[in-house]
Design a protein with these regions (language model features):
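Substrate-binding/catalytic cleft of secreted carbohydrate-active enzymes
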Residues: 109-112, 121-242
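Secreted/periplasmic carbohydrate-active enzymes, especially glycoside hydrolases
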Residues: 1-124, 128-131, 136, 140-144, ...
Length: 242
């Protein structure tokens, strides 16, 4: 395993194994360049599979961004500095494909357009966003609040499907440095009566805790905009007649 900054290998490790195995290793990077909207620095990660007798068998490359999201004294922080969000609620529609972009360039254009309008964050509302969108957010420096489509009627089936799909989404996307917040629930959709029904409130709290257990490297907004029972941030959605 090698971590590269440009053409230079800045960290590496070799792990011996046999047969099918899950490998974990920890690499130390001295004085890392932290990812931020102003400097969305990414490191290349290279994994090479070697056979002691025949040499290289396979190689895969990816990338990683290093950053810290925290809440300090009631203030959302990125890399230890107070963070002021200029965010847009983005439902990810495309004229040709509704929720599906027809090209990778269309996804990149969405990120570039958001940044060009002066925003530094997008809340991907009611959509598990395309991984290529997240790639461009990582690369171009757009922070993301990641959400999922909500259920409508509270039931055992909702609990099972939502929990399974949410876990899959977190495990798929948690390596993206651009994601600074997980939003498992929006405005009590699917849990409309959590203030009166303990089982609904317990479900919200359980999913919030599950999210933190799967990934504690960013904040969790348990129920965005409506009743608060758990999570790192308390958010309000205020609607005014125009």
């Amino acid at each position: 395993v090698e971590v590269l900054d440009g053409n230079s290998v800045i960290a590496s490790d070799t792990v011996q194994t046999a047969g099918r195995a899950e490998i974990r290793t920890t690499l130390f990077i001295e004085d890392p360049i932290l990812w931020s909207p102003e400097q969305p620095h990414l490191y290349e990660v290279r994994l090479t599979l070697l056979n002691r007798a025949t040499g290289e068998l396979d190689e895969a490359t990816s990338y990683a961004g290093l950053r810290e999201v925290s809440v300090t004294d009631g203030q959302l922080c990125l890399n230890g500095d107070p963070l002021y969000l200029r965010g847009v609620l983005d439902q990810g529609y495309f004229p040709q494909g509704w929720y599906t972009a027809t090209t990778d360039e269309a996804l990149r254009h969405d990120v570039e357009l958001t940044l060009a309008m002066g925003f530094n964050c997008a809340r991907k509302h009611q959509k598990a966003e395309d991984p290529r969108y997240l790639y461009w957010a990582d690369k171009l420096g757009l922070m993301v609040w990641a959400e999922r489509p909500s259920g409508r009627v509270f039931s055992t089936e909702l609990i099972e499907s939502l929990t399974t799909e949410w876990m899959e989404l977190i495990k798929r996307d948690r390596a993206n440095p651009s994601i600074i917040a997980w939003v498992p629930f929006n405005e009590s959709w699917g849990v409309w009566h959590q203030s009166e029904r303990p089982e609904q409130r317990a479900f919200v709290d359980a999913v919030t805790s599950l999210t933190k257990a799967l990934d504690d490297s960013r904040v969790v907004v348990g129920n965005d905009g409506w009743e608060y029972s758990s999570g790192d941030l308390w958010t309000l959605h205020l609607y005014n007649d125009c």
